[in-house]
Structures are given as C-alpha cells and as structure tokens.
Amino acid sequence: MFGVGIDIIEIDRIRKSYQTYGDRFLKKIFTEGERVYCFSKSNPYASLAARFAAKEAVAKALGTGIGKLLKWKEIEMRRDSRQPQVVVPEALLCSLGVKRVLLSVSHSREYATAVAIAE
C-alpha cells in the first residue's frame, strides 16, 4: 500500500459556496461530467460534497495535496458501476509508483465523506 486518505465535509458548505460563487466555484473544482451527474440528482449538493471529499481523500492518499502536482479537475470521480471509480493522470500515478486508487464515498443528511487507498 502506498497511502491512505480520508476527508469529511459539511454538505451545507458546498451549497453555500455554490450560492456565493455560482458556476465559477463549480467549474474550478468539478469536471463537466461530475457537474452534469450531480445536478441530475435530487440532492445535487450531497453528490457534489461527496466528490469534493473524494478529491481531497485521493490527494491525501497520493501525498500530493491539491496544488502544483495535482489540480482539482485532474481527479474525477465516475459512477461507471455500483462502485465509484476515480480517474487520476496516469503520468502522476506512474511517477509515484502507484498502480491504482480505490475509493469509497458516503453521505448522510449533513456530511459527505470519502476514503481513498493508493496501492
């Protein structure tokens, strides 16, 4: 195992950020596919918060944080199956010696959380 990352966020924080900054906030953090998926849900803020937590958890598991080596939109969470899939630049994974990143996300009424394992 290379690293483990975990994150938790209040769903209301994402809602307030969207209400304050609008699409500018969304376009900085989330890919177009993530935005489309989340706004197709009955509670888009819970889905957005889960993806935000996932991005933070992945960055922690890789040990890069969000910044020079890894940008927000370079981490994309997809729902191709029942299990969430995470897409990260292959070149970065190779340079770190990471073969894959596993991801688990969940949310309640107030919080979203994610755990990432880099192997």
Curated annotation (Swiss-Prot):
UniProt-recorded Gene Ontology molecular function terms: holo-[acyl-carrier-protein] synthase activity; magnesium ion binding
Top EC category: transferase
Chief location: cytoplasm
Reaction(s) catalysed by this chain's protein: apo-[ACP] + CoA = holo-[ACP] + adenosine 3',5'-bisphosphate + H(+)
SUPFAM superfamilies reported for this sequence: 4'-phosphopantetheinyl transferase
GO annotation terms (biological process): fatty acid biosynthetic process
Keyword list, A-Z: Cytoplasm, Fatty acid biosynthesis, Fatty acid metabolism, Lipid biosynthesis, Lipid metabolism, Magnesium, Metal-binding, Transferase
Family matches, as InterPro entries: 4-PPantetheinyl_Trfase_dom, 4-PPantetheinyl_Trfase_dom_sf, ACPS, Ppantetheine-prot_Trfase_dom
Subcellular location, record wording: Cytoplasm
EC number: 2.7.8.7
Cofactor section: Mg(2+)
Gene Ontology cellular component annotations, sorted alphabetically: cytoplasm
Function, in words: Transfers the 4'-phosphopantetheine moiety from coenzyme A to a Ser of acyl-carrier-protein.
Designated name of the protein: Holo-[acyl-carrier-protein] synthase
Source species: Chlamydia trachomatis serovar L2 (strain ATCC VR-902B / DSM 19102 / 434/Bu)
